[in-house]
Amino acid sequence: LFTLVVLLMVSADMAFAGFGCPRDQYKCNSHCQSIGCRAGYCDAVTLWLRCTCTDCNGKK
């Protein structure tokens, strides 16, 4: 039971830290463009919870 509670807490943190992901990919894209990247998308590897930026000229 304790392990389940910890996993749920970690999942909630990841969902709030996703710059719009998984619900708003446009917000993720806008975030990435605002920091100088070409585009952004919600990463399927993390079940669409993480915003991944592309072509950032040395930034990530």
Curated annotation (Swiss-Prot):
UniProt-annotated binding residues for beta-D-GlcNAc-(1->4)-Mur2Ac(oyl-L-Ala-gamma-D-Glu-L-Lys-D-Ala-D-Ala)-di-trans,octa-cis-undecaprenyl diphosphate: F19, G20, C21, H31, C51
One of the record's GO cellular component terms: other organism cell membrane
InterPro entries: Defensin_invertebrate/fungal (IPR001542), Scorpion_toxin-like_sf (IPR036574)
Highest taxon of the lineage: Eukaryota
Main location: secreted
Pfam families named among the record's database cross-references: Defensin_2
Molecular function GO labels: lipid binding
Localization in the cell: Secreted; Target cell membrane
Coiled coil segments of this chain: none
Signal peptide: 1-17
UniProt entry tagged with the keyword Signal: yes
Residue ranges of the region described as Binds to membrane interface: 22-25, 43-49
GO annotation terms (biological process): defense response to bacterium; innate immune response
Cysteine disulfide partners in this protein: C21-C42, C28-C51, C32-C53, C37-C56
Keywords for the protein's UniProt record, in alphabetical order: Antibiotic, Antimicrobial, Defensin, Disulfide bond, Immunity, Innate immunity, Lipid-binding, Membrane, Secreted, Signal, Target cell membrane, Target membrane
UniProt note on tissues of expression: Expressed in hemocytes.
Entry comment, domain topic: Has the structural arrangement of an alpha-helix connected to a beta-sheet by disulfide bonds (CSalpha/beta).
Record function comment: Antibacterial peptide mostly active against Gram-positive bacteria. It acts by selectively inhibiting peptidoglycan biosynthesis through complex formation with the cell wall precursor lipid II (1:1 molar ratio) thus inhibiting cell wall synthesis. It does not disrupt cell membranes. Is noticeably less potent than Cg-Defh2 and Cg-Defm. Shows no or limited activities against Gram-negative bacteria.
Family: Belongs to the invertebrate defensin family.
Protein name: Hemocyte defensin Cg-Defh1
